[in-house]
Regions:
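ATP-binding N-terminal substructure of ATP-dependent carboxylate-amine bond-forming enzymes
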Residues: 1-116, 135
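Active-site nucleotide/adenylate-binding loops and adjacent lid/helix of ATP-dependent enzymes
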Residues: 107-142
Length: 142
């Protein structure tokens, strides 16, 4: 099992992927070529990644019991898109390591946090303005 982010994942290990879309499918194919097995967790029974994965679980991202079972069956977990509930990753993170860290998901789910994070790294972004109401929108357009 992976203990720290820098620990290598040994071939034959099981990578858990939350999400079973096309990106999950491509990740599963690449992982298999490198000697890893993949367990896909998706609420979609016919998720494309399930077709190319050794294991799969069909359940809601809010089903904490199934998430815990999934986490116990893998060596590390990743996610293919940012619409996974943060609570799901927190549940998994108590059992199996999540890469990237679950905090990356929290940033990716909030566009203002995402812009602020990128800006804090010294990377330029397009101009943006937080808009919560009509007054904010009017101010942003000035």
């Amino acid at each position: 099992m992976v203990k720290t982010p820098s620990d290598p994942l040994e071939p034959g290990s099981i990578i858990g992927i939350l999400g079973g879309g096309q990106l999950g499918r491509m990740t599963a194919i690449a992982a298999a070529r490198l000697g890893y097995r993949v367990h896909v967790f998706s609420p979609d029974q016919s998720a494309p990644a399930k077709e190319v994965s050794k294991f799969s679980t069909t359940a809601s991202y809010d089903d904490l019991v199934r998430l815990e079972e999934f986490a116990r069956s893998v060596d590390v977990v990743t996610f293919e898109f940012e619409n996974i509930p943060a609570q799901s990753l927190l549940t998994i993170n108590n059992i199996a390591p999540v890469r990237p860290n679950y905090r990356a998901l929290e940033v990716a789910q909030d566009r203002l946090k995402e812009k602020a994070f990128v800006s804090s790294l010294g990377i330029g972004t397009t101009n943006y303005w937080p808009v919560q109401n009509v007054e904010d929108l009017e101010q942003a357009l000035v």
